[in-house]
């Protein structure tokens, strides 16, 4: 798959739609974060937090799926293991306008395991293939897989390759987002599973070498633009997780560095656009402490960033319906 971006010739003609992605992250990649991210990068592919099939089929659909048109391209990540439930949830997501439906085969948490989905599905590639096949039959948008490189006893590339082959050949999956760590389902917390298992990016790069017909996206340990650029010589795309919220300003560098876009991103202008969004959201009943979370690290490393962050953190809980808190925080930035 290649990008069709006639309106923006700066994007390489052969660039994958997955060239740069922001990972789905629980408690982080909500619609507020994604709106800010889009002010910083026109080209990043954005993902929702994981939404379970039960939440969509039996819960508040609007709360889980609402998003702003500016967020495109945006993907919905689903958690589940029942093919028909996933197909119906995918259909709902596509009807809401999502550009992609992604299946979570990587989350190692006990709660997710108890629901029989996430990383534990790597032990059942035939079921994953059935799920992907059902989802693909239900929607016209791409259906993708995000997985680890293995679980527990699975150590070798051949085991990982077997999983991919089954899901690709029997399920029709064409896009694999590879978190280049294995997951220990017992004995490690989700946080430990993000750090303790060693990174094995060679699994993703070798997969691309051996299966050039697939779109392969590397996820895990990518924190610097230079490393992302180097990885793109070997895979179709990169996906960034924690670095995208620990230093959200990193996204302001992506379009120039990875897409050749000559436009310089003004972080202050991005914040002003987000401030207008905040005012509208407060009018709908959203509280300021929720809305400031994405912008706390926007100016990391800049003079006054600490005072800016402190003002937001201290004042937002006290004045939860006052967007002027953001204006006052901007005044703390000495480099303006």
What are these regions (language model features)?
Residues 1-336:
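Flavin-dependent oxidoreductase catalytic cores
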């Amino acid at each position: 798959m290649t990008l069709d971006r006639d309106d923006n010739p700066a994007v390489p003609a052969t660039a994958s739609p997955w060239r740069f992605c922001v990972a789905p992250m629980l408690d982080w990649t909500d619609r507020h974060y994604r709106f800010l991210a889009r002010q910083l990068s026109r080209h990043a592919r954005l993902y929702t937090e994981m939404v379970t099939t039960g939440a969509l089929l039996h819960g508040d659909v609007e709360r889980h799926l609402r998003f702003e048109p500016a967020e495109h391209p945006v993907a919905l990540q689903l958690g589940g293991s029942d093919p028909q439930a996933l197909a119906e949830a995918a259909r709902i997501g596509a009807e809401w306008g999502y550009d992609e439906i992604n299946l979570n085969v990587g989350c190692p948490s006990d709660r997710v395991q108890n629901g029989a989905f996430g990383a534990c599905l790597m032990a059942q590639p035939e079921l994953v293939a059935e799920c992907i096949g059902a989802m693909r039959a239900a929607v016209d948008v791409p259906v993708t897989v995000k997985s680890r490189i293995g679980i527990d006893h699975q150590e070798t590339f051949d085991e990982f390759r077997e999983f991919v082959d089954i899901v690709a050949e029997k399920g029709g999956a064409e896009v694999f987002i590879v978190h280049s760590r294995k997951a220990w389902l017992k004995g490690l917390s989700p946080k430990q599973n993000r750090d303790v298992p060693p990174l094995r990016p060679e699994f993703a790069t070798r997969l691309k070498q051996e299966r050039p017909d697939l779109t392969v996206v590397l996820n895990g340990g990518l924190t610097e633009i230079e490393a992302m650029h180097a990885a793109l010589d070997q895979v179709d795309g990169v996906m960034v997780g924690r670095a995208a919220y620990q230093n959200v300003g990193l996204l302001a560098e992506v379009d120039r560095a990875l897409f050749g876009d000559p436009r310089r991103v003004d972080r202050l202008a991005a914040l002003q656009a987000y401030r207008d969004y905040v005012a509208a959201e407060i009018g709908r009943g959203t509280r300021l402490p929720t809305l400031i979370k994405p912008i706390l690290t926007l100016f990391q490393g800049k003079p006054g960033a600490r005072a800016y962050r402190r003002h937001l953190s201290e004042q937002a809980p006290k004045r939860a319906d006052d967007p002027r808190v953001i204006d006052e925080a901007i005044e703390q930035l000495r480099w303006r």
